Amino acid sequence: TDVARYRAGDLDMTNYALPPEQFAKLQKELPGEVFTTRTLATYSYELNNKKAPFDNVNVRKALNLSLDRNVITDKVLGQGQTPTYVFTPTYIEEGQLIQQPAYSKEPMAQRNEEAIKLLEEAGYSKANPLKFSILYNTNENHKKVAIAAASMWKANTKGLIDVKLENQEWKTYIDSRRAGRYDAARAGWNADYNQATTFGNYFLSNSSNNTAKY
């Protein structure tokens, strides 16, 4: 691994993500040598807006409300990632003009109550939960995030959401997204340049990256 090669002196530095479970330990063992830098990138899940039930905006809102980003950034990943509720980083040029939604400041208990209400209004119950799959490309960190998200959605909505995980190798995963063969999928974007439109262009109706069909 890169960690072993670095310790042996074969590597001077690496830009590969360290295993989350080793990060804090390595920071203590190698003070001043293990650190992360902020990048113009966002990790997200996209929902297939052309496919039921995600053609219902209230279902999409319920998922947004009941996902605790802080758990993912602080406990699952734990390498300095910042929780956000918008796609464009606020520290990119002109990104400071973008406002986080009001619900991001609400207590999780309140957000969960709102999510449950929206799901019940959409016809879901413990006997008839919202069922869907999260598609992600094969990677241990993606798997850990997906497991955490699935668990939170189920717990925070008191069983109104039931999520399964589906992993595919990179090429198949990309093909599935482009063809719309998914419910929810791991997504994200790395900036091409230091200006907010590099993230906004992702959602243009004629963009090949707009696989969620906004």
What are these regions (language model features)?
Residues N15-Q22, R69, T88, E169, ...:
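Beta->alpha turn/N-cap motifs
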Residues Y16, V76, Y103-E106, F132-E140:
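Short beta-strand->loop
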Residues T73-D74, E106-A109, L160-Y173, R178, ...:
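Extracytoplasmic/peripheral linker and loop segments enriched in polar/acidic and small residues
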Residues T1, N112, I116-A191:
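Ligand/substrate-recognition segments at binding pockets and active sites
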Residues R7, L11, K28-P31, A52, ...:
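Sec-exported extracytoplasmic/periplasmic mature domains
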Residues Q81-E121, N139-K144:
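Structural transition elements
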Residues F23-T36, R181, Q195-A212:
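Ligand-binding "clamshell"
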Residues T1-K51, D74:
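Extracellular/periplasmic solute-recognition and catalytic clefts
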